[in-house]
A protein has these predicted regions:
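A well-structured
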Residues: 1-289
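Accessory "access/gating" subregions that flank catalytic or transport cores
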Residues: 289-296
Length: 296
């Protein structure tokens, strides 16, 4: 199994091992802020160092998020995620804006090969354009609110045949050849989700309100239009997406409907229900994946 490990890329700006907190990473941001860029070579190295710093932080946050979603009940893991969201990320946003401004002010920026850096520079300009300091705290609230959804969903479980299952585990029963079992499990799962309906509706409404505030602060009518710019979607717009939706409805949905009718016919059903879509129509039992690395 050790042969499957992907070797980590050697670092040149940061130590290969470093405990991530604001105190330990601040010196690297200060280095980037204070470094003089007096040649194209120094600008290029500055960009490489910044990329390494941001990559390390993105990976660290990603692992905190993954661990938190894998176990929403572990207080230590949750605290680590919230610490990054509340004590590191807001400061990162401030420094990111300052660093963006620094590079845009550099006289050597447009000496970089346009074919390689056009998209990067375009993104920098847009990030500076839509940045609003008042949105930093809202983004923190959004992170924490989104985490709450994961905690609520992760805590859901159902009892089937006197055994407790997570909803993900229970969904494997939807591949059972016995339709009565599939129906019972499907209804049990949906009933469990509905128990948290009010809580999730309130959370969703709060998320919508906060996202709309972010958009309004940045001068946009709605969060969709803001996100198009924030995510760098410069080569297509919302109208293009709506046209794509129409194309899917016209070209793909009829195919899916036809496939569903064929499935229902092969299963001897007049109507296909949501709990009939995962089962093997040839009568084969559901596949059982490997349980651990040794089996893999």
């Amino acid at each position: 199994m050790n042969n499957l490990l992907i070797p980590k890329k050697e670092r040149h700006f940061l130590p290969n091992t470093i405990e991530i907190n604001w105190k330990t990473i601040l010196p690297f941001f200060d280095d980037l802020m204070n470094r003089e860029l007096i040649s194209l070579g120094e600008l290029t190295q500055w960009m490489i160092d910044r990329s390494e710093l941001e990559s390390v932080l993105e990976e660290d946050f990603a692992w905190r998020y993954i661990r938190m979603t894998c176990d929403t009940t572990d207080e230590k893991i949750l605290k680590a995620f919230e610490d990054f969201a509340t004590n590191i990320e807001p400061k990162l946003a401030e420094y990111a804006n300052l660093l963006n401004q620094k590079i845009m002010d550099c006289e050597f920026l447009y000496e970089l090969p346009a074919s390689e850096y056009f998209i990067y520079i375009r993104s920098l300009k847009k990030q500076l354009e839509i940045f609003r300091e008042e949105n930093i705290s809202i983004f923190t609230e959004l992170q924490l609110a989104q985490q709450k959804y994961g905690a609520i969903a992760g805590a859901m479980s159902v009892t089937i045949e006197d055994k407790e299952y997570t909803l993900e585990q229970a969904s494997t029963f939807l591949k059972d050849q016995d339709r009565n079992i599939r129906k019972t499990v499907y209804e049990t799962i949906q009933a469990r989700r509905l128990k948290d309906r009010n809580q999730l509706d309130k959370l969703f409404n709060n998320l919508i309100a906060m996202r709309q505030q972010v958009a309004s602060n940045a001068g946009f009518d709605n969060f969709r239009d803001y996100q198009f710019q924030a995510l760098g979607r410069f080569d297509y717009n919302a109208k293009d997406c709506l046209a794509f939706h129409d194309a899917i409805a016209k070209e793909v949905v009829p195919i899916l409907k036809s496939n569903s009718l064929k499935r229902a016919s092969k299963m001897g059903l007049n109507n296909l229900s949501p709990f009939d879509t995962e089962v093997d129509i040839t009568g084969k039992a559901a596949l059982k994946p490997f349980a651990n690395g040794e089996e893999l």
